Amino acid sequence: MRMNDHQDSESFTYERTWHEIEDMLDRAERKQNMHYTKMQKAIKSERIYHMRNYKALEGVVKALRWVLGDKNIDHPLE
């Protein structure tokens, strides 16, 4: 897979519903909250794991909010 395969429209179905996207956002936020809670209570080695996953999900949440038109998200990559 090339880095710019997103330009290949045959790879995308564009069939996701708003409900599916909202559900994914809800799941991502719940998972992010779980990692945040565990990060607060964990020993250092485990805290790093939860911190890394929390930060990764931060990007997922921001991108999904942008897709849904959140007025507070100007651009998902900033």
Predicted regions and their residues:
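Short, charge-rich amphipathic interface segments used for partner binding and complex assembly
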Residues: 34-78
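Short, charge/polar-rich alpha-helical segments
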Residues: 2-29
